[in-house]
């Protein structure tokens, strides 16, 4: 299994911050091949937003309850909003590769709405692109270098993720 990630102020704790329009809290990637299973279970969700981009393979999501299983394939993103139930798994047999980013801010809801993300939807088809992977890797690197990611850094690349 390959893991690469970066965290705002090197903190693994989720946070809510309305001091700026958009603040990236963390970003990373997982690539499973031999690792059997990588589960995530957050019954009360998180304080921030999360986007998961499935770059390869597939992932299993349980949006409304732990028993429902929705398979999301490469070329899609999943959007979680604050305090939403989160349960999902990646399996090595699926050769899953995902990129994820957690973010908060005073204008996040408007930014998402302006880019075509309605409030009542979790899954968005965006297609696969090496450009998406490059954008996520750039965010990871900036977080690892302790650079502050502001709206300017994020808004331009997210235009490529627009549905």
Sequence positions of predicted segments:
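Single conserved hydrophobic/aromatic residue that forms the stacking wall/gate
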Residues: 152-163
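Short, solvent-exposed positions on alpha-helices
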Residues: 70, 148-152
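N-terminal regulatory/effector-sensing and dimerization cores
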Residues: 19, 26-119
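Aromatic/histidine-rich interaction motifs
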Residues: 114-137
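Alpha-helix N-cap/helix-start motif at coil-to-helix transitions, marked by capping-box chemistry
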Residues: 18-21, 102, 126-133
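A short, N-terminal "cap"/entry segment at the start of jelly-roll beta-barrel domains
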Residues: 1-23, 142
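Short, charged, low-hydrophobicity "junction" segments
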Residues: 1-8, 108-111, 134-138
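Regular secondary-structure segments
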Residues: 55, 133-147
